[in-house]
Amino acid sequence: MRRVFLSHEPYVIEYHEDWENIITRLVDMYNEVAEWILKDDTSPTPDKFFKQLSVSLKDKRVCVCGIDPYPRDATGVPFESHNFTKKTIKYIAETVSNITGVRYYKGYNLNNVEGVFPWNYYLSCKIGETKSHALHWKRISKLLLQHITKYVNVLYCLGKTDFANIRSILETPVTTVIGYHPAAREKQFEKDKGFEIVNVLLEINDKPSIRWEQGFSY
């Protein structure tokens, strides 16, 4: 693991070498906006803003991207809920359960699924206020997602409205699926069949499909 230092909290980023190419720019950009972000009590806390940068990208085939961390108790790992109480991850687990036939489980974590990189476009928000830091993260978010798409085969974005224009900011040609948010009404997320579509797209590109059931804990 490599380390780089910041002028503001969290003061240090520990990162995997796969992120090396953009680290200097990330540090410069963050130091410009950090004081505005840190004026608020944040979700997640600053020490968890960059947690996913410790993860390798070379072995990832799919990025599952949400727009924002949970407005309370975010862990720095997108969609993660240690006590399995967050609606978003419960809806994701329910959908995967219906696809795979796994019925009895205690939790679900996309970070445990081989080949999948969970990501949030914005890395923090003010506690209780979703997308409240969107303006501050805008340039950094674009830099990081463009970097991620150089590694993955499929970008699966959760939120039709939030990600309507995402293709316009991507410089790397990447297969992009824009689906409903897991909490969308009338089970639109499940009807979307996004997880199945991702696997079809991988197979078309001669890549192994994702075993979504690996995210379950028992």
Swiss-Prot record:
GO biological process terms on file: DNA repair
Gene Ontology MF term list: DNA binding; uracil DNA N-glycosylase activity
Keyword Membrane: no
Enzyme class: hydrolase
Positions in coiled-coil regions: none
Keywords: DNA damage, DNA repair, DNA-binding, Hydrolase
Keyword check for Chloroplast: no
EC number(s) stated in the UniProt entry for this protein: 3.2.2.27
Catalytic activity: Hydrolyzes single-stranded DNA or mismatched double-stranded DNA and polynucleotides, releasing free uracil
Active site annotation, chain numbering: D68 (proton acceptor)
Family (UniProt): Belongs to the uracil-DNA glycosylase (UDG) superfamily. UNG family.
Function recorded in the entry: Excises uracil residues from the DNA which can arise as a result of misincorporation of dUMP residues by DNA polymerase or due to deamination of cytosine. Also part of a heterodimeric processivity factor which potentiates the DNA polymerase activity. Binds to DNA.
UniProt subunit comment: Homodimer. Interacts with protein A20. Component of the Uracil-DNA glycosylase(UDG)-A20-polymerase complex; A20 and UDG form a heterodimeric processivity factor that associates with E9 to form the processive polymerase holoenzyme.
Protein name from the UniProt record: Uracil-DNA glycosylase
